[in-house]
Design a protein with these regions (language model features):
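...captures the hydrophobic TM-helix bundle architecture rather than a specific catalytic motif
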Residues: 1-272
Length: 272
């Protein structure tokens, strides 16, 4: 199986979001749901195929010196944020990404399937806004998949934001219900606070690593995982001497990124 299908695994839910969001109103509600399930089913099958090929295939993804190799499927230039701080858009497979593709697509498939009945009334008729619901589910799936195959930490932040937006849209799906409106607003506000810390942590980390000119290769980016993981011991050691306005940069960035993740996952005390 071609590892370029990683792109298809991520792009198919995006296509389903656009297709169901734009054309769903022209189709029957049940047909929209069935197409959503089929689309997610295809995505899930592709994800399993990719993971099996990565872990058990020959060639790429082999274990070298006890470490299974990371595969950069694609990496396109996007934003130049400063000297040695570039934000690209790309796709990479490593053991964690391959496993998370399976986890995300499997759970999403069963959510799509379960929703066919859950989002119907006692007579089996799909609820109003059924097409919109399945479009939002596809967007949510796309956002999570894009995050786990990211090649750099800034791309993770971008998809991290998209997860927050799609969560807000799903929580507030019943927009005529005061309780749903209140819950969606509360979730949106709390996650925006978390997003601020995450972004600030990314900025501090990018600034700090970019100062290590001997460890960031020419044409490389301080935000890319290939740079951050190329020599983690040396990077961590040298970052200990880097400060951000008088504050040690490494612990500051890691604490901020942790708060971002904690807020997004509603960990205490951001569980309100």
């Amino acid at each position: 199986m071609d590892f370029n299908l990683t792109i298809a695994v991520v792009a198919l839910p995006l296509f389903m979001f656009l297709f169901l969001g734009l054309a769903g109103v022209k189709m029957g509600r049940k047909l929209t749901g069935v197409l959503g399930v089929i689309g997610q089913g295809v995505t899930t099958v592709l994800a399993y195929g990719l993971a099996l090929t990565y872990f058990f295939g020959t060639g790429q993804g082999q274990i070298v010196d006890g470490v299974r190799q990371t595969i950069i499927v694609a990496d396109w230039s996007w934003l130049n944020l400063g000297d040695k701080v570039m934000a690209n858009i790309g796709f990479e497979l490593d053991p964690i990404a391959a496993m998370m593709l399976i986890v995300i697509t499997t759970i999403s498939f069963f959510v799509h399937l379960y929703s066919l009945g859950y989002m119907s009334d006692h007579d089996g008729n799909a609820e109003k806004g059924f097409q919109r619901y399945y479009a939002f589910l596809a967007l949510f799936t796309f956002s999570m998949l894009g995050m786990v195959v990211a090649t750099n930490i800034f791309q993770i932040f971008v998809f991290f934001e998209m997860v927050g937006v799609s969560s807000y849209l799903l929580i507030g799906f019943y927009y005529s219900s005061p309780a749903a409106i209140h819950a969606s607003k509360k979730a949106f506000i709390v996650t925006r606070l978390a997003d601020f810390f995450f972004l600030f942590g990314v900025i501090v980390l990018g600034f700090a690593v970019s100062t290590l000119t001997n460890l960031v290769p020419e044409g490389g980016s301080a935000l890319s995982f290939s740079t951050l993981l190329s020599n983690p011991e040396a990077i961590a050691s040298q970052l200990g001497a880097v400060e951000f306005f008088g504050i040690p940069a490494l612990p500051l960035s890691l604490i901020c990124i942790f708060i971002g993740g904690a807020g997004k996952s509603a960990m205490y005390p951001l569980h309100i």
